[in-house]
Amino acid sequence: IHTMGRDDSRSDLYRYPYEPTPYCVLERMANTGMIRKGNTLLDYGCGKGRVDFFLSAQTRCQSIGVEYDDRIYAKAMENKKAAASGARTEFVLESAENFPVPVEVDRVYFFNPFSLEILRKAMARLLESYYENPREIQLFFYYPSDAYISYLMTVPELEFLDEIDCMDPVSYTHLRAHET
């Protein structure tokens, strides 16, 4: 599958460029045990499907990727044909704010894919799904903006649980050595 490369050809003030999550970060997520075989992961701004394919393969979860850009969505669908975890992965061509969240979704991934305005609308859809079928839903944010964090802290249904250390151990050791 081909998921590399940044694509900002259709980005604007509301929808940010496609940039794949590094595999080392996905490995750390998979190794936390927070995503398992019985889970359904929703990946907002899925791009070419890296998060969906990797986590479906590593954790055996079901995965739904939502992408608004038809060109990038087409690349995800091409990748699905070649991916070993393609049968556990579904892609939907839709904007996040209009996507009705399926009641089985219990894990959600965001790599800062869109503006705060769109995040608010996506969260409203997510909460609608939660109230339709109450369940524990875990949200994962990779590089959340300060605006995201400020907003999320005002949503009464949310509770901060933990951070996953995604720093590269080699870089971290190097940084620590220079701090003394």
Each predicted region: which residue ranges?
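Conserved class I S-adenosyl-L-methionine
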Residues: G38-G45
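Conserved SAM-binding motif I beta-strand of class I
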Residues: S63-E67
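S-adenosyl-L-methionine
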Residues: I1-R36
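Conserved SAM-binding strand-loop segment of SAM-dependent methyltransferases
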Residues: G86-E94
